Amino acid sequence: MNSKTSQTPSAGDGTMDRRNFMGAALGAAAGAGAAAMMASGAAAAADSPPPPAAAPPMGPPPGESLRAPGGASGPKLYRVEADIRDVEIDGKIPSDLNGAFYRVGPDPQYPLNPHNIPFDGEGHVSMFRIQNGHVDYKSRYVRNDRYKAQAKAERILFPMYRNPSQDDPSVNGLSRSTANTHIINHRNYLLSLKEDSPPAALDLLTLETIDPNYRFDGQLQSKTFTAHPKIDSETGDMIAFGYEAKGFGTDDVNVFQITPQGKMVWNAWIKVPYVSMIHDFAVTQKHIVFYVMPLAFDEQQIKNGGIHWSWNSGQPTYFGVMRRGGDGKDLRWFKGPERSSTHVMGAFSDGEHVYVDVEMSQYNPFPFMPMRDGSRWDPVKGASQITRLSADLSKKSLKDYKMEVLYPGFFGALPRQDDRYNTAQYRYGYLPCPDPDPKDRSKRPAACWVRFDHQTRKAQIFNSGDGTTLNEVVFAPKSKTAPEGVGYLMGVANRNFENGRSDLIILDAEHPEAGPLATVKLPIRAVPQIHGLWVPEYQLKTA
């Protein structure tokens, strides 16, 4: 494997041709959300032709086939639940790294409808259990209502992403949740999340489903629950929200706060300017921030049998800020140009200034999301970069928000931070991205993980080399009280030249360019992943 350290390159240094960018966008999750799942098909995506015609009313643009959510050379359906003891390790697991690395992603039980998108598919959770230098691997499907109904029927019953009008009549009124997007540790449960439904509660150690529709002891008022709750850096409280909270297509958002013991201590309702995919949000010690973008609810497309969203080009964005703990009446919406922002790296308040670091593209980041105006998807405009959004709340007449690209030469999605700093000012961020300065520009850039230092604006790069696709990277602190950024980075690498076989790579977070401290070598391909979570040993001992 190759590695290097880099200063932030100029915008020109990061320029890619259309073919390379398409491969990088899919292969390094430079779109957003489930692009890590798409990443496993990166080798094929790099050779895909651009869409030749206008987008259809549903599904991917013409010429864009749906990529298998697993390894590049693997089968389109994976469905392997595994238990592997003492996985082979190259190198040495650090003695202070003990806990569990969890992952979740869509792994369809049955072939997807050809007009459906890769966001769909039943949630499959995996765990790398790390103890005393040894690693065990386990994976299990989330056994929720949807999974059990389809298993009994032995066929797909929910054929279109977030469109209940297409469901089989036998599942009318049944929860449609896939529980396939993210996971979080709460009250000794592993909550598997999908933003259109309540969570599913799993056992932290066995991954068996305990409650397929977990509603926090009846306290959850919203019909939905975000895939990206935040943990307060001081109290450990969980701040979360649901959009379309009063039902399908509604403009209601419910935001709330729950203690580590499970008590809801704050609850507020707000309205949004229009119904869009609010996949993530930002929380600081003082403020809540929502971002409304033109990936919008498309009622006509749904009536025509299509998916929930389409990109409504030309529609403005809105940066909404409200104070934590209030009733939401102080909510202010700041207007901006057409943009997409799907994930938050970190956020903080400095007096009345609010700062939110996000992945941001000029427009639709997803090649499989329909363009409402029928135009072709543009991979260049769909490229995401880490961008700082800000607003000065002391200026009562302020109508818009500011945008600053922090690292112009880097394109990527699925940003992360040290999660202990979810609501506090932070220094380090992490991102999967294509190599910003490949030696051979005629080839598809290698996949990298990058550590950004916001104080110096420098970047350190781990380069995975040829034939590898990297999933999202997650930070694990050395200890509960370790300084920010002192610990390890870990994530799954799919080996595209080995039929998609997977490795877990562990790096020194302070020196990722030095290469792996340890490589955990699975004999199989790991289950698909959108997001992952590190849970330290001291939290598992209470489970």
Question: Model segments located where?
Answer:
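Beta-propeller domains
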Residues: F21-G33, P49-A543
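Residue-level detector of intrinsically disordered terminal segments
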Residues: T15, A36-M37
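Signal peptide processing junction and immediate N-terminal pro/mature segment
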Residues: M37-P50
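N-terminal secretory signal peptides
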Residues: M1-D17
